[in-house]
């Protein structure tokens, strides 16, 4: 089985998505970036834009209005001000 990335997408109102995924594309404040399993840890601010989640050949898109991302060896947590699909 290929490595997966533990991913949580959270808004102030609710947990929008919690899943093991292949990759995440994030709209960073200083430019878009991708996160794969075992990525180096860091935190970053997010700008308004599209977050993409890839898993098993399928992609989900979410519209964010900014927030923060926390990348750890265990996974990624996106805390967004608001989230639309």
Name each region found by the language model.
Residues 4-85:
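Compact, glycine-rich, soluble single-domain proteins
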């Amino acid at each position: 089985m290929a490595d997966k990335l533990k991913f949580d997408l959270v808004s102030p109102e609710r947990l929008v998505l919690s899943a093991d995924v292949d990759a995440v594309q994030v709209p960073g404040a200083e430019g878009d970036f991708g996160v794969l399993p075992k990525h180096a840890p860091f935190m970053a601010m997010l700008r308004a834009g599209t977050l993409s989640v890839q898993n098993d050949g399928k992609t989900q898109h979410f519209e964010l209005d900014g927030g923060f991302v926390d990348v750890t060896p265990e996974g990624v947590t996106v805390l967004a001000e608001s989230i639309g699909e």
